[in-house]
């Protein structure tokens, strides 16, 4: 969902970013992880990144896991927040700190892949040392080694719905519509159950 969008003026097609982000973090928690890093966009972002951070916090709060704000890492890049480069940089910074964690959740598969590269370069292993979860369902996440767990967005269905709404608005002067799709949790090689 898009916060701040006037639903009377605009149409929208999206996933519920809070709900789907919570689903990703719930999965990590169910695998025994409590010290979970969140790689996000700018701290002032109230749209996609901000909503996914809300889902992260909600999952931890519901399980009464304390939120360590030092494990929420933000990029300050304005236009290219969701990139592999930013995931890589944020993870390198974190690995050089004293913060302890067992899992990484990135707001995009691209950031998850960048973070994974930094983890592997540090001599650590995925998932033996750190589990990694992304968001989007990009093909590259499947082909990366180890394959990245993710929340897959139904991109084709969302594109079809967007076209349908657009043509209906143009041809029939229809009212604005808002469609929310469910994402799919896809657990792959990058997430492992934590042995306590």
Language-model-derived ranges and their functions:
Residues 1:
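Mobile cap/lid helix-loop segments that gate and shape the active-site cleft of serine hydrolases
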Residues 4-196:
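Bacterial carbohydrate/catabolite-sensing allosteric modules
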């Amino acid at each position: 969902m898009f916060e701040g969008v006037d639903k009377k003026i605009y149409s929208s097609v999206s996933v519920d970013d809070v709900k789907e982000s919570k689903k990703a973090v719930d999965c990590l928690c169910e695998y025994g992880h409590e010290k979970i890093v969140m790689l996000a966009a700018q701290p002032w972002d109230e749209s996609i990144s901000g909503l996914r951070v809300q889902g992260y916090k909600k999952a931890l709060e519901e399980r009464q896991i304390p939120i360590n704000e030092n494990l929420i890492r933000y990029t300050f890049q304005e236009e290219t927040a969701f990139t592999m480069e930013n995931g890589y940089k944020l993870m390198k910074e974190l690995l050089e700190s004293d913060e302890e964690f067992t899992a990484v959740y990135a707001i995009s598969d691209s950031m998850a892949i960048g973070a994974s590269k930094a983890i592997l370069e540090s001599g650590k292993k995925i998932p033996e040392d750190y589990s990694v979860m992304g968001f989007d369902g990009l093909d590259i996440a499947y082909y990366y080694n180890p394959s990245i767990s993710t929340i897959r967005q139904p991109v084709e269905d969302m594109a079809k719905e967007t076209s349908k709404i657009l043509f209906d608005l143009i041809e029939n002067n229809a009212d604005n519509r808002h469609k929310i799709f469910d994402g799919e949790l896809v657990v792959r090689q990058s997430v492992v159950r934590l042995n306590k």
